[in-house]
Amino acid sequence: MPIKKPCLKLNLDSLNVVRSEIPQMLSANERLKNNFNILYNQIRQYPAYYFKVASNVPNYSDICQFFSVMYQGFQIVNHSGDVFIHACRENPQSKGDFVGDKFHISIAREQVPLAFQILSGLLFSEDSPIDKWKITDMNRVSQQSRVGIGAQFTLYVKSDQECSQYSALLLHKIRQFIMCLESNLLRSKIAPGEYPASDVRPEDWKYVSYRNELRSDRDGSERQEQMLREEPFYRLMIE
């Protein structure tokens, strides 16, 4: 007597649906790579950007003492259990996601308070493209700690478009902002600190360095350095 075999039918429709969605599931980084040339050309069409410097900003000793206070639209938080003092804009200018792009600023340990005094007008500026940043409380770190000898400032960059993308205007403002930070420190003859092994920077950046924290680690390596130098965001900052 013949054995009846069950009728097994592969549902190809579901596979087709998944397959059709694959081109749309590009990561934010891949989208930025695909749009690199367009953004590169658009950025160069913008004139130089001039940032309005904030007045009546706190000095370094002030923010080391505060627990939580509002300054120039930024909430400053200094928890006793944290080595960092955090600043976050109450009404963010960039409504998109954080996709890992950030900058460090490395200063000689003894000059961190002075560096903050020099940069605070820009960091608190209403024109600043940076909605969130932090600075090391030097009273809470050891002499040779990573964020004691360098990387005392961290600037977090958020996207401003759908799909975690950056507009050309925001990228232009960030480029100009970094240039202003660098030039102010250089003009004031601030001594640079030791920039992190996890980061990359071009030769003309003396204080600022870049890292994408979602695609790298703190230890750094030759392979990681090469990968970071190929990041489209970083290239749009320096090329």
Curated annotation (Swiss-Prot):
Please, which domain of life does this record's source organism belong to?
Bacteria
Would the keyword Secreted be found if you checked this record's keyword annotation? yes
Q: Which residues form the active site?
A: H104 (proton donor), K134 (proton acceptor)
> Which Pfam families does the entry mention?
VRP3
Q: Which GO terms describe its cellular component?
A: extracellular region
Class in the EC hierarchy, top level? lyase
EC numbers: 4.2.3.-
Q: In terms of one coarse class, where is the protein primarily found?
A: secreted
Compartments (UniProt record) = Secreted
Alphabetized UniProt keyword annotations: Lyase, Plasmid, Secreted, Virulence
GO function terms (MF aspect)? lyase activity
UniProt cross-references to InterPro entries, sorted A to Z: OspF/SpvC, OspF/SpvC_sf
NCBIfam families in alphabetical order? PRK15245.1
Which family is this sequence assigned to? Belongs to the phosphothreonine lyase family.
Record's function text: Catalyzes the removal of the phosphate group from the phosphothreonine in the mitogen-activated protein kinases such as MAPK2/ERK2, MAPK3/ERK1, MAPK8 and MAPK14 in an irreversible reaction, thus preventing the downstream phosphorylation of histone H3. This epigenetic modification results in inhibition of the transcription of a specific subset of pro-inflammatory genes, and ultimately to a reduced immune response against the invading pathogen. The diminished immune response enhances the bacterium's ability to disseminate and multiply within the host.
Put simply, this protein is called: Phosphothreonine lyase OspF
User: Which species does the entry assign this protein to?
Assistant: Shigella sonnei (strain Ss046)
> What gene, per UniProt, encodes this protein?
ospF
